[in-house]
Amino acid sequence: LMISRYSRKELVSIWSEENKYKIWLDVEIAAAEAMEKYKIIPKGVASLVKKKGKIKVKRIHDIEAKVKHDVIAFLTSITEQAGLKARYLHQGMTSSDVLDTTLNIQLVQSGNILLRDIDKILSVLKKQAKKYKLTPCIGRSHGIHAEPITFGLKLASFYEEFKRNKLRLKDAIENVSTCAISGAVGTFANINPKVETYVAKKLKMKAEPISTQIIPRDRHAHYFAILGIIAGSVERVATEIRHLQ
């Protein structure tokens, strides 16, 4: 749950219920397109759902309150709008195929915003480091005045740290850019592996090499560990600025 006064509009939008369900729909439509291509379901399902399926958050919640299952509630809502042909959606899939693929897409979307932020930070730090390269200030050891340095050197240090952060974040985004459309235990028992390949390409992701019911969580742990490192860098800059006062 995001606290509104501390949240950015772009990120609130990415993690909103409406965007989550929109991505669910994108995943289901992509899977349906693949199933049509490989003659698993009748032609026209994907185009029908794309045309008539709308995200109705309140209706999904109302259905979920009765059926106690989020994906069933979502699919029921879409079927109400698109008609019985929509019953072919989700064939051979498991809920986590949709949930985990969507989570990773949201992480990629958020990460790309943070990458743009880092680029802005780098631009400012580079400019200011050059501007103040000869401006003297005190260096500190254990927080105590030590020997003179320049303010530009301090900013250059921040610049190099955020260069490393950019590389780390790009790697984390790449690492979490996987999807899984592999069924209840990841064995493709009731779904053609070609469906997963199609969905991955359609959504600009990579197929998870080996999944179980879920996408392995070490990918997410790595992503959030990198966010923690970046947060530490931001804190370092803030503390250094405070010490200048």
Regions found by a protein language model. Give the residues of each.
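A helix-coil-helix interface module used to build multimeric assemblies
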Residues: 1-182, 188, 192-198, 207
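Glycine-rich anion/phosphate-binding loop at the beta-strand->alpha-helix junction
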Residues: 165, 213-245
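A short, charged helix-loop
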Residues: 198-214
